[in-house]
UniProtKB/Swiss-Prot annotation:
It is found in: Secreted. One of its GO terms (cellular component) is extracellular region. Pfam families: AtDEF-like. This is Putative defensin-like protein 274. Disulfide bonds join C35-C76, C41-C64, C47-C74, C51-C75. Keywords: Antimicrobial, Disulfide bond, Fungicide, Plant defense, Secreted, Signal.
Length: 79
């Protein structure tokens, strides 16, 4: 009986760690004028995965901006 309780507690701890790691790894949106900055890119095609999320209310068009001090970043604009 004690062994099954230990297994249950260990399982709950593992699930809470997975949930907290997943929640922290979500990409954050930064607004810069009309752009929603998401992810890095080398060309406009790289922005498709960053600008077309299933959680977005509407599809966005993505363009790669090379002039940012942090490096090239995707500018996502609502269509």
């Amino acid at each position: 009986m004690a062994s099954s309780r230990f297994q249950l507690v260990a399982l709950l701890v593992v699930f809470s760690l997975v949930i907290s790691i997943t929640a922290n790894s979500v990409e954050k949106d930064v607004m810069d004028g009309p752009c929603r900055l998401r992810g890095t890119c080398n060309n406009d095609g790289d922005c498709d995965k960053h600008c077309h999320r299933s959680t977005d209310a509407a599809a966005m068009d993505g363009h790669c901006l090379f002039d940012k001090p942090t490096g090239p970043v995707c500018c996502c604009l609502f269509d």
